[in-house]
Amino acid sequence: MNFDAVFSSPLQRAIRTAELAGFPDPQLTPVLREVDYGEYEGMTTKAIHESRPDWELYRDGSPGGETPAQIYARATDFITLASAVKGRVLAFSHGHFLRAVAIAWMRLDIKAASALHLDVATLSLVRDDERGRVLAMWNSPP
């Protein structure tokens, strides 16, 4: 499959995934970096829930990190970047951020991102067709 642009988060795990998928020279863009978890960086959701049982990333954000509105705005920034490409775009990023991209693509409230499950190293496809912006494939194994 050919792509007109391949973008990646500047984090090594995304770059390495791009390389393993056969794309050794993606365009690095900080807009695709993982969500800034602030004080929760490095903590599991389970650990966060021990002190904040009702915490939800896309509703509450993270203390000292990105707010849900900031996550959504950055997702929209990536959509703008990708939409400027005439043709097919491939992106290597991170789970929580890619959920936000899918939700922003469909113009839904960021809180809806919590309903999306996304495994590591899976394929998802958004596109514009006669119905408008659609989530054509989600969390599919390679």
Language-model segments: residues:
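Short glycine/proline- and acidic residue-enriched helix-loop micro-motifs
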Residues: 50-70
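Generic structural signal for well-ordered alpha-helical scaffold segments
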Residues: 76-83, 102
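Generic beta-sheet signal
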Residues: 85-96
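Glycine-rich phosphate-binding loop signature in dinucleotide/nucleotide-binding domains
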Residues: 1-2, 82-87
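Short beta-strand scaffold positions
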Residues: 8-9, 73, 92-93
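Acidic, low-complexity terminal tails and accessory targeting/binding regions
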Residues: 35-46, 103-142
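Phosphate-coordination/substrate-recognition cap region in phosphate-metabolizing enzymes
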Residues: 1-52, 56
